[in-house]
């Protein structure tokens, strides 16, 4: 992944997992298999990416139903296209956050951190500081080239490096640690 796709995944994670207007989030919550649904995107300075989705208030027995609904809904979103108003809203939010970060008091330290991380992995340290080109390219690709839909298909649906993890509480753990 590169800087452009990292930025795209940040916006896409909000569209898919965190926005109240997300068809994916709304379908999963309305299905009754969980109380809440969310997800996040993690990246490193060397552009390694992880997309994580989670259910809150669900049971392990709902894993297959969740996986089927998740994949069907992502496929539908990728085939039919994402809602342009939702994309514009999340792109605006991302752009606002990027510009807001540029006005922080410790801006110099942030710039050094961004450029050093890029330099460390043999990337252009100055490219990491240029946001205008990043923002305009992201907006153009998302709204004119079905970029987010392609990412959903290639990186989420057709990705062989997918892991499913179930975390269940141990009801006796509190009593055990208190003893």
Features from the language model and the residues they span:
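Core subunits and conserved enzymes of cellular information-processing
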Residues: 152-155
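Active/ligand-binding-proximal structured segments within catalytic/core domains
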Residues: 4-16
